[in-house]
């Protein structure tokens, strides 16, 4: 029963996330067509954005193992050592995640043009579009990392359902933002990564508030002093 209590919310959250990704694509493609872009132009924009998303997901390959490894570590500390040891592990995880996420975020944001030119082979207008998209996605990595580590911390404490609810709320914010921003002629496809950024910001805030409310000793030092953004 305990295993199901953890597995069901996580499985439901993963399925809902995939559904929202499909809805996001449908929304921004529809908005681009409504703006007067041809199907070919809209498909090109989707392809460029998809390539930028692939680059955006690369830092997760380094951050995800951290979040996976801290769950049993925190659980064992809670069982054998108490809340203080668990809190120390959580704060270390936040700092280490920041050490990985911050260079990736600013590196991709500041070097968006040469990175997309090298990995995507773009030039001209497509390169300019990829640069703008990658810049926004670069800064999104910061909040994505915070979401990953805070979700793992709450799961280790047995609160697997709350991160899923927060993720669904952030997903709705993302979809609404994409619908509004992608429908603006001056923003168009740039509204898609901007909506993603807004969604992750909302999830990050909700996760932090949830940890302060649900955890006996949340990693307050790391979060209140914004260790993640200064690591």
Language-model-detected regions and their locations in the chain:
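Interhelical loop/hinge segments that connect adjacent transmembrane helices in multipass membrane
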Residues: 1-12, 81-84, 213-230
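Membrane-interface junctions at transmembrane-helix termini in multi-pass inner-membrane proteins
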Residues: 139-169
């Amino acid at each position: 029963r305990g295993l199901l209590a953890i597995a069901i919310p996580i499985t439901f959250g993963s399925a809902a996330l995939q559904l929202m990704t499909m809805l996001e694509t449908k929304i921004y493609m529809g908005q681009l067509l409504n703006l007067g872009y041809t199907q070919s132009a809209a498909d090109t924009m989707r392809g460029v954005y998809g390539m930028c998303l692939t680059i955006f997901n690369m830092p997760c390959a380094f951050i995800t193992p951290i979040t996976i490894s801290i769950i049993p570590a925190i659980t064992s500390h809670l069982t054998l050592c108490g809340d203080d040891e668990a809190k120390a592990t959580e704060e270390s995880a936040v700092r280490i995640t920041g050490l990985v996420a911050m260079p990736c975020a600013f590196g991709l944001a500041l070097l968006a043009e040469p990175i997309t030119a090298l990995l995507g082979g773009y030039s001209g207008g497509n390169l300019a579009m990829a640069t703008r998209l990658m810049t926004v996605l670069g800064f999104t990595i910061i909040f994505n990392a915070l979401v990953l580590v805070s979700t793992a911390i709450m799961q280790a404490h047995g609160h697997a359902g709350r991160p899923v609810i927060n993720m669904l709320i952030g997903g709705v914010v993302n979809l609404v933002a994409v619908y509004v921003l992608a429908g603006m002629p001056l923003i168009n496809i740039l509204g898609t990564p901007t909506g993603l950024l807004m969604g992750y910001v909302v999830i990050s805030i909700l996760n932090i508030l949830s940890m302060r409310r649900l955890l006996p000793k949340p990693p307050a030092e790391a979060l209140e002093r914004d260790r993640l953004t200064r690591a």
